[in-house]
Curated annotation (Swiss-Prot):
One of its GO terms (cellular component) is cytoplasm. It comes from the Bacteria. It catalyses: Hydrolyzes single-stranded DNA or mismatched double-stranded DNA and polynucleotides, releasing free uracil. This is Uracil-DNA glycosylase. Its EC number is 3.2.2.27. Keywords: Cytoplasm, DNA damage, DNA repair, Hydrolase. It is an enzyme of class 3 (hydrolase). The active site is at D77. Excises uracil residues from the DNA which can arise as a result of misincorporation of dUMP residues by DNA polymerase or due to deamination of cytosine. InterPro entries: UDG_fam1, Ura-DNA_Glyclase_AS, Uracil-DNA_glycosylase-like, Uracil-DNA_glycosylase-like_sf. Its main location: cytoplasm. One of its GO terms (biological process) is base-excision repair, AP site formation via deaminated base removal. NCBIfam families: PRK05254.1-1, PRK05254.1-2, PRK05254.1-4, PRK05254.1-5, ung.
Length: 236
């Protein structure tokens, strides 16, 4: 796979990448890091259990087209437990037990806006223009951060950079160190975007400033100022 192109991705992945995002990211596929990432992923999926399933790796991009992104919520890497990861940051499929970070997200949402959610699938948020993007898009089962440093960070950097350069008035929500690291891209940008930052909602960090951040009401305040529809945070 020395001259990797998008056509050499597994078919299920290619089908999950919408044409709008494929066009925006077309230059990434011939870069050396992508060639190495594809080789690594091919081997990982062959020899280990990897999450999410291949047809869900690009679920965030599939769910929120490039020209419809209004908010970006950056996560870290997918949940490493069986059945949890489905390609949207912080989200779990219907019927899955809520992970601790998502419990804390819902706790803050209730404190902020009085909204209670009990199901963990955030698909309706994605459908409203929230790009639920992890910094790293795959993980080996039971091994958090096992796919960090393999190339995904460069790919998601490219996603964020494209949004910064080609779009205006996007709200970037940065929870945790990995997300804040990407904020360096924003600080170097002269384009008009908003940034909301806090510690990660995990139990280890939430009490350091995630609780009380009021990001959900702040997002809707900013959207309202831009005459854009506000987010309905209540899950169906």
């Amino acid at each position: 796979m020395q001259n990797a192109t998008i056509d050499q991705l597994p078919v299920s992945w290619q089908e999950q990448l919408p044409l709008c995002w494929r066009e925006q990211l077309k230059e990434e596929w011939s870069k050396p890091y992508m060639q190495q990432l594809l080789i690594f992923l091919k081997q990982e999926y062959k020899e280990h259990t990897v999450y999410p399933e291949e047809n869900c790796v690009f679920s965030a991009l599939r769910s929120t087209p490039f020209d419809q992104v209004r908010v970006v919520i950056l996560g870290q890497d997918p949940y490493p437990g069986k059945g949890q990861a489905h390609g949207l940051s912080f989200s779990v499929p219907e019927g899955q037990r809520l992970p601790p970070s998502l419990i804390n997200i819902f706790r803050e949402l209730k404190t902020d806006l009085g909204i209670e959610n009990h199901k963990g699938c955030l698909q309706s948020w994605a459908n409203q223009g929230i790009l639920l993007l992890n910094t790293v898009l795959t993980v080996r089962a039971g091994e958090p951060f096992s796919h960090a440093g393999k190339g995904w960070e460069l790919f998601t950097d490219a996603i964020v950079t494209k949004l910064i350069q080609e779009r205006t008035h996007i709200i970037f929500v940065l929870w945790g160190a990995a997300a804040r690291k990407k904020c360096e891209l924003l600080f170097n940008s002269k384009h008009q975007h908003a940034v909301l930052s806090s510690p990660h909602p995990s139990p280890l960090a939430a009490h350091r400033g995630f609780f009380g951040c009021s990001h959900f009401s702040k997002i809707n305040y900013l959207l309202n100022k831009l005459n854009k529809p506000m987010i309905n945070w209540k899950l169906p």
